[in-house]
């Protein structure tokens, strides 16, 4: 009994309440090496409700439980199972994994339902946001309409206060209507021009992209050194462009300041007069500085006289050298003319052979002239003739080559004919060479004569230009001498100019003081008008309406941003894609597992 009691205390009671004494019943399958243990499954993931599988809590083992008292751990590792209800699950088969997948699919469906509910909520909120946006747009339109009505009412109040008649109001209405029609027409024109410009911009952008692609291809085909140079030049270009942008911004700001100042000046006549006086003063000061610089640059009368005399001497030397060159050329021309006359006289004296030679030379000269005139035609004719002769020569050579094979069978008569043909060929070749040499000689003579003629024409043009320039210089020098000889008159005129400038300076200073006082008065009036305008109720109402309008625009912009962010947050498409992808992967794993189990 003691032993039995001890064994019953050592073994835990099974689910049926019956203790195991001795060996386990035949219904329990003993542990063996063929049992598959789910090592990949996490603790507590066994399908609930399966036979003999304990429900895992997923926690840590408590210190009170001992290994001897409990053969099954809470992490799912199976030991010796006891129970009267039959064998517990020892093998993780297909039904187990299907149960797990069903539980996961149910969890995924619940999550998808939750997401769909959230999407519906976001859609409802978006519809509310859209209604708010539409309401904001309608409110903005109403504000604009109310502003227009307010302006109309203010205009009517002004008209009533000024006691204007109905005819004037109708005239103003007609004028405004005509102006609006003109502006609508101009807007239509601007719209069409804008469309045309946009088309041009698109075409230009396409061309730019094509050019960029072409440049990229060129850069790729370049060598490494050229690519490095290109990159360096590109960086420098970018730096220069940045500097250009900054300078352009500075220039734009300066232009804006200039335009604002010009607008301020345009409204006040006093400022315009002040600007004109400042410009006049600047011109007078620059003229004064110029006169002072001239006075400083001008030395003593003796030095100026020496400079002028030196310049006159240099010019006289140049004139003398040019006159010498002119006389030399004239003498050469006269010599050539005399030689020609002597030749003419000699030719007239000598008759007979000399006269005939002279006539032949004249004819040759005429022939040369005609040849120069008809050079191109003769050249073409000679080239054609040359080509024809070459063709004839080729034909004769072919004929000769054909007849060479028959030399042995040909009699003495054929030898004579062959000699005749050779003589003809030699004669024709010599004629061709003579014609080529004559053509070359004629072309060289023509080129030489043309160069000589061009040189003579250049010399004549240079001589005429130098003559004109020297004559103009002489005239200017004579006028300068006449002016600078009268030194006391120059001094008196300079002193008179200085006195006039001093008087004008005094007058301008008095004007400046007066304008300063006027400016102070105008500023006081401006400040008074400003205070009156700030105290006016209509002005305050308009400012308040403008502030409200700005506030509504800011709210509208904030609502638009809020709508955009919420629409991005409610985008469930990536989550949906991820879920569908995971389901597909799980299905694939199930199919693979089924195939593997069926194969085993």
Curated annotation (Swiss-Prot):
Q: Where is this region: Disordered?
A: 1-33
Q: Where is this region: Important for interaction with IFT27?
A: 561-600
Expressed, tissue-wise, as follows: Highly expressed in adult and fetal kidney and expressed at lower level in adult heart, placenta, lung, liver and pancreas, and in fetal heart, lung and liver. Little to no expression was detected in adult brain and skeletal muscle or in fetal brain, thymus and spleen. Detected in sperm (at protein level).
GO cellular component terms, alphabetically, are: acrosomal vesicle; centrosome; ciliary tip; cilium; intraciliary transport particle B; motile cilium; nucleus
Q: Coiled-coil ranges per the record?
A: 98-482
Give the InterPro entries listed for this entry.
IFT74
Q: Where in the cell is it found?
A: Cell projection, Cilium; Cytoplasmic vesicle; Cell projection, Cilium, Flagellum; Cytoplasmic vesicle, Secretory vesicle, Acrosome
Q: Which UniProt keywords apply?
A: Bardet-Biedl syndrome, Cell projection, Ciliopathy, Cilium, Cilium biogenesis/degradation, Coiled coil, Cytoplasmic vesicle, Developmental protein, Disease variant, Flagellum, Joubert syndrome, Methylation, Obesity, Phosphoprotein
What are the GO MF terms of this UniProt record? beta-tubulin binding; chromatin binding
Keyword Coiled coil listed: yes
Coarse class of the primary localization is: other
Q: Name one GO biological process term.
A: Notch signaling pathway
Give residues where Omega-N-methylarginine occurs.
51
Region called Basic region, residue ranges: 1-90
Tell me where in this chain the PTM Phosphothreonine is found.
73
| Stated role | Component of the intraflagellar transport (IFT) complex B: together with IFT81, forms a tubulin-binding module that specifically mediates transport of tubulin within the cilium. Binds beta-tubulin via its basic region. Required for ciliogenesis. Essential for flagellogenesis during spermatogenesis.
Quaternary structure, per UniProt, is:
Component of the IFT complex B, at least composed of IFT20, IFT22, IFT25, IFT27, IFT46, IFT52, TRAF3IP1/IFT54, IFT57, IFT74, IFT80, IFT81, and IFT88. Interacts with IFT81; the interaction is direct. Within the IFT complex B, IFT74 and IFT81 mediate the transport of tubulin within the cilium. Interacts (via basic region) with beta-tubulin (via acidic region); interaction is direct. Interacts with ARL13B and IFT88. Interacts (via the IFT74/IFT81 heterodimer) with RABL2B. Interacts with IFT57 and IFT70B.
The disease this record links to the protein is:
Bardet-Biedl syndrome 22: A form of Bardet-Biedl syndrome, a syndrome characterized by usually severe pigmentary retinopathy, early-onset obesity, polydactyly, hypogenitalism, renal malformation and intellectual disability. Secondary features include diabetes mellitus, hypertension and congenital heart disease. Bardet-Biedl syndrome inheritance is autosomal recessive, but three mutated alleles (two at one locus, and a third at a second locus) may be required for clinical manifestation of some forms of the disease. Joubert syndrome 40: A form of Joubert syndrome, a disorder presenting with cerebellar ataxia, oculomotor apraxia, hypotonia, neonatal breathing abnormalities and psychomotor delay. Neuroradiologically, it is characterized by cerebellar vermian hypoplasia/aplasia, thickened and reoriented superior cerebellar peduncles, and an abnormally large interpeduncular fossa, giving the appearance of a molar tooth on transaxial slices (molar tooth sign). Additional variable features include retinal dystrophy, renal disease, liver fibrosis, and polydactyly. JBTS40 inheritance is autosomal recessive.
Family classification: Belongs to the IFT74 family.
Give the protein name, as stated in the record: Intraflagellar transport protein 74 homolog
Gene label: IFT74
């Amino acid at each position: 009994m003691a032993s039995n009691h001890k064994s019953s205390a050592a073994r835990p009671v099974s689910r049926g309440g019956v203790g195991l004494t001795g060996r386990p019943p035949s219904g329990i399958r003993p542990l063996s090496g063929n049992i598959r243990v789910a090592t990949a499954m996490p603790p507590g993931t066994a399908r609930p409700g399966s036979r003999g599988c304990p429900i895992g809590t997923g926690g840590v083992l408590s210190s009170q439980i001992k290994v001897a008292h409990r053969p099954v751990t809470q992490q799912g590792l199976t030991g010796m199972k006891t129970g009267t209800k039959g064998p517990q699950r020892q093998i993780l088969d297909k039904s187990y994994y299907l149960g797990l997948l069903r539980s996961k699919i149910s969890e995924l469906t619940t999550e998808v339902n939750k997401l769909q509910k959230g999407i519906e909520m976001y859609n409802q909120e978006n519809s509310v946001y859209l209604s708010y946006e539409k309401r904001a747009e309608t409110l903005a339109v109403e504000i604009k309409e109310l502003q227009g009505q307010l302006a109309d009412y203010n205009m009517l109040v002004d008209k009533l206060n000024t006691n204007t008649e109905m005819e004037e109001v109708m005239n103003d209405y007609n004028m405004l209507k005509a102006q609006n029609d003109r502006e609508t027409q101009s807007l239509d024109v601007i719209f069409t021009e804008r469309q045309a410009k946009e088309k041009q911009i698109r075409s230009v952008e396409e061309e730019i992209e094509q050019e960029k692609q072409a440049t990229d291809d060129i850069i790729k085909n370049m060598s490494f050194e050229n690519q490095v140079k290109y990159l360096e030049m590109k960086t420098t270009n970018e730096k220069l462009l940045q500097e250009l942008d900054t300078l352009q911004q500075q220039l734009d700001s300066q232009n804006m300041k200039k335009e604002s100042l010009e607008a301020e000046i345009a409204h006040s006549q006093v400022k315009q007069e002040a600007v004109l006086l400042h410009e006049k003063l600047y011109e007078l000061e620059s003229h004064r500085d110029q006169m002072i610089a001239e006075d400083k640059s001008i030395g003593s009368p003796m030095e100026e006289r020496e400079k002028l005399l030196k310049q006159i001497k240099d010019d006289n030397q140049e004139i003398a050298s040019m006159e010498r060159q002119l006389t030399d050329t004239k003498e050469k021309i006269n010599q050539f003319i005399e030689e020609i006359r002597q030749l003419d006289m000699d030719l007239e004296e000598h008759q007979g052979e000399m006269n005939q030679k002279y006539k032949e030379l004249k004819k040759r000269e005429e022939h040369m002239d005609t040849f120069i005139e008809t050079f191109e035609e003769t050249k073409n004719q000679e080239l054609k003739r040359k080509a024809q002769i070459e063709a004839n020569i080729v034909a004769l050579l072919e004929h000769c080559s054909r007849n060479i094979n028959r030399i042995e069978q040909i009699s003495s008569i054929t030898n004579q004919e062959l000699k005749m043909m050779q003589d003809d060929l030699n004669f024709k070749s010599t004629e061709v060479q003579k014609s080529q040499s004559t053509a070359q000689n004629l072309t060289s003579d023509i080129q030489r004569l043309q160069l000589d003629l061009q040189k003579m024409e250049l010399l004549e043009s240079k001589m005429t230009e130098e003559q004109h320039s020297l004559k103009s210089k002489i005239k200017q020098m004579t006028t300068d001498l006449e002016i600078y000889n009268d030194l006391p008159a120059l001094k008196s005129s300079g002193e008179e100019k200085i006195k006039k400038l001093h008087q004008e300076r005094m007058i301008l200073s008095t004007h400046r003081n007066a304008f300063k006082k006027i400016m102070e008065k105008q500023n006081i009036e401006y400040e008074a008008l400003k205070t009156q305008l700030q105290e006016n109720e209509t002005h305050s109402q308009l400012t308040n309406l403008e502030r409200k309008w700005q506030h509504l625009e800011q709210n509208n912009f904030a609502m638009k941003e809020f709508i955009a962010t919420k629409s991005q947050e409610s985008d469930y498409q990536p989550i949906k894609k991820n879920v569908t992808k995971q389901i597909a992967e799980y299905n694939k794993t199930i199919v693979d597992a089924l195939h593997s189990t069926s194969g085993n």
